[in-house]
Amino acid sequence: METSQKYHTCGSTLVQTIDAPLSLVWSILRRFDNPQAYKQFVKTCNLSSGDGGEGSVREVTVVSGLPAEFSRERLDELDDESHVMMISIIGGDHRLVNYRSKTMAFVAADTEEKTVVVESYVVDVPEGNSEEETTSFADTIVGFNLKSLAKLSERVAHLKL
């Protein structure tokens, strides 16, 4: 019996501690209309529907050198009280098919001046790729974005001191 690749998924969870207060980190992270503020793989972003709130759809152009040119993404949830956002990739010319992520931000346990950001995702494993290859690719992108968010947040936090 042949296993269908259609339902073969993988996922991961990445954690980033940021030396900046939750309110600052969330103010950057929650901007669905401006991911290029910290996601350095994003060249441009335009909302094709909505105002940046739940249900909004954005068209993202990716910087050259990556194995993609664009991505279409939907904001499924944005909770400013719980500091949670969920995004689905609904189109594009890349290998992250049926990518769904949940990002949460919390005050760090040891000090209110730090924030912990947790991003988890699930994505289809493309035909011809392994779970390990797909997870490694997605982890690299998500990890780089979280590190970039940390750098920007920490730079802004230190400017405010």
Curated annotation (Swiss-Prot):
Domain notes for this protein: Upon interaction with ABA, the 'latch' and 'gate' loops change in conformation leading to a tight dimerization and the creation a surface that enables the receptor to dock into and inhibit the PP2C active site.
Family: Belongs to the PYR/PYL/RCAR abscisic acid intracellular receptor family.
Site (Involved in interactions with PP2Cs): P67, S130
Primary subcellular site in the record, as a coarse category: cytoplasm
Stretch list, region START-like: 3-154
Residue stretches in coiled coil: none
Entry GO terms, CC: cytoplasm; nucleus; plasma membrane
Molecular function (Gene Ontology), one example: abscisic acid binding
Assembly description: Homodimer. Binds ABA on one subunit only. Interacts with PP2Cs. Binds to CARs protein in an ABA-independent manner, both at the plasma membrane and in the nucleus.
InterPro entries: Plant_def-hormone_signal, Polyketide_cyclase/dehydratase, START-like_dom_sf
CDD domains: PYR_PYL_RCAR_like
Lineage: Eukaryota, Viridiplantae, Streptophyta, Embryophyta, Tracheophyta
GO biological process: abscisic acid-activated signaling pathway
Motif (Gate loop): 64-68
Entry keywords, A to Z: Abscisic acid signaling pathway, Cell membrane, Cytoplasm, Membrane, Nucleus, Protein phosphatase inhibitor, Receptor
Protein name, entry field: Abscisic acid receptor PYL11
Motif Latch loop per UniProt: ranges: 94-96
Binding annotation for abscisate: 39, 68-73, 95-101, 119
